[in-house]
Amino acid sequence: MVEWANITWIMLHTFTVKIKENIIITHNNEIKDFLYLVINNLPCSICRNKSKKYFNDNIKTIIDKKTLILFLYNFHNFVNLILSKKQFDYHLLDRYYLTKTEEIFSIFNKLNQYPDEIKDFLIDNIIWFND
């Protein structure tokens, strides 16, 4: 897998499992906007275009932490299906509870060429996450 893809998945799964429950409720639209921004800037055009449709078709399912985690898990497997890759096992999500959020976000920001808006969101909202 391409380097940007690995760290992007790590960042996104860390994001979903480490975010505080109350943040999803109080900042639901901001979280959805952030996820859309990441998807809209995926370097892989095939992934980006199909992902935007998936996002638009399924984004309303995110109402709490559980549904956010499930949305991203299903989205990851949707992308893997497009790329003819092995499905991502749900139990692998457990490892993201052990990550250090700020460290993952920092690595993501250094390794990617995403717009500053994405990087700034992660830095500015680090207090939204448990560690």
Which stretches of residues belong to each language-model region?
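Aromatic-rich, lipid-facing transmembrane alpha helices and their immediate juxtamembrane interface loops
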Residues: 1-131
